[in-house]
Amino acid sequence: MTIAPTTLLLFAATALAELVGCYLPYLWLRKGGSVWLLLPTALSLAVFVWLLSLHPEASGRVYAAYGGVYIASALLWLWWVDGVTPTRWDLLGAACCLLGMAVIMFSPRSA
């Protein structure tokens, strides 16, 4: 596997861990879920941090680029979990963010 697909898969897994880690407390606080949801929340957020640490790039660059993937993933979550269809403006915004992520992560670097 080349660096680009590996990076994208790692970003996608990271976004899923973060979204789950944020959604479970939402279920507890806003939807009457059990306080026990905080246990998988802690695990999910620990996995999120661990996944972010696996990238070979400088942390600031990884965090900046990951933001674009997170935005696109959050819109997929909006659609698949919340049942709300993203607007064309949502999709255009996510596409811009993903383009920014690609520029940040995959542009040539000096040695």
From Swiss-Prot:
Its main location: membrane. The chain crosses the membrane at residues 8-28, 32-52, 64-84, 91-111. Pfam families: UPF0060. It is a multi-pass membrane protein. It is found in: Cell inner membrane. One of its GO terms (cellular component) is plasma membrane. Keywords: Cell inner membrane, Cell membrane, Membrane, Transmembrane, Transmembrane helix. Belongs to the UPF0060 family. This is UPF0060 membrane protein XAC3064. It comes from Xanthomonas axonopodis pv. citri (strain 306).
